[in-house]
Amino acid sequence: MAHKKAGGSTRNGRDSNAQRLGVKCFGGQLISAGSIIVKQRGTKFHPGKNVGCGKDHTIFAIVKGKVEFKKKGLKKRTYINIIN
């Protein structure tokens, strides 16, 4: 009879799921109210006109319209606006 002894154990073999962060709607794109524009950690992008910010810093549209990215201020922060 063929014999195979027990294999050793390993401490590897785990991996976390991707977080799927990033820009979901780009500049000039038409979107509806409630659509997610950016999923992010921290505020790389800041909410502007007609845009809201969730507790996990997700930027979303409040009204239907066109997405606009604008750099503003001394620190050149990127603000996202919706033009309707």
Curated annotation (Swiss-Prot):
InterPro entries, A to Z: Ribosomal_bL27
Q: What are the alphabetically sorted keywords of the record?
A: Ribonucleoprotein, Ribosomal protein
State the signal peptide span.
none
A single GO cellular-component term from the record reads: cytosolic large ribosomal subunit
Q: Which GO terms describe its biological process?
A: translation
Q: Which Gene3D superfamilies match?
A: 2.40.50.100
Q: Which GO terms describe its molecular function?
A: structural constituent of ribosome
Q: Could you say which protein family the record assigns here?
A: Belongs to the bacterial ribosomal protein bL27 family.
Q: What is this protein called?
A: Large ribosomal subunit protein bL27
- What organism is the protein native to? Buchnera aphidicola subsp. Acyrthosiphon pisum (strain APS)
Gene from which the chain derives: rpmA
